[in-house]
Amino acid sequence: ADMAEAYGAEVIRLDFEWGKPADPDIVSAALDNESGIKAVMVTHNETSTGVTNDLEAISKRVKARPETLLLVDAISSLGCIPLPVDSWSCDVVAAGSQKGLLIPPGLSFITFSPLAWEAQKNAKMPRFYFDVAAAQRYLERGQTPYTPAESLFYGLDKALDILLGLG
């Protein structure tokens, strides 16, 4: 939310009791009470408390408004708990290498739904380093836009073998 505000987005914060999950009905009420909400951001699993938000229920509330994007922080959930991105209609999911993927920080992972790809094409906020369209163009050529932490790719390869072995 702080980063979105720094880029000029109008942010409506929903605060929930520390150590308690977000209430999907309160999320739904906020969407009903405020017109023009373009996206809902939610943390799937909060690291410091271990609270897992009911992302499936929140998604159902958000996706009752099909034009609203669901943005998910999966930093501490990816690789640890189920996260069926497509069936839960998550539009953007962002995660890092440093928690459930068993390796040091330095890699990030992001998924975009078709709706999110369309939204980023029309986005007016400034971007340079985190330009997903540029990253996609490089990916199509088998490259990265900047120098990657190559050693982490080797670690990720091993970590994924371990995770796949666990089922």
Where are these regions (language model features)?
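Active-site phosphate-binding strand-loop segment of PLP-dependent enzymes
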Residues: 22-79, 92
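Active-site C-terminal subdomain of aminotransferase-like
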Residues: 98-167
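Short, well-ordered, mixed-charge alpha-helical segments that flank or form enzyme active sites
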Residues: 20-24, 47-52, 78-82, 87, ...
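Generic secondary-structure signature for well-ordered alpha-helical cores
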Residues: 5, 9, 32-36, 42, ...
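PLP-dependent aminotransferase-like
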Residues: 1-36
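Short, structured patches in soluble enzyme cores that scaffold and shape functional sites
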Residues: 15, 41-45, 74-76, 96-97, ...
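Conserved active-site segment immediately N-terminal to the catalytic lysine
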Residues: 86-98
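Alpha-helical scaffold segments in soluble metabolic enzymes
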Residues: 3, 26, 57, 61, ...
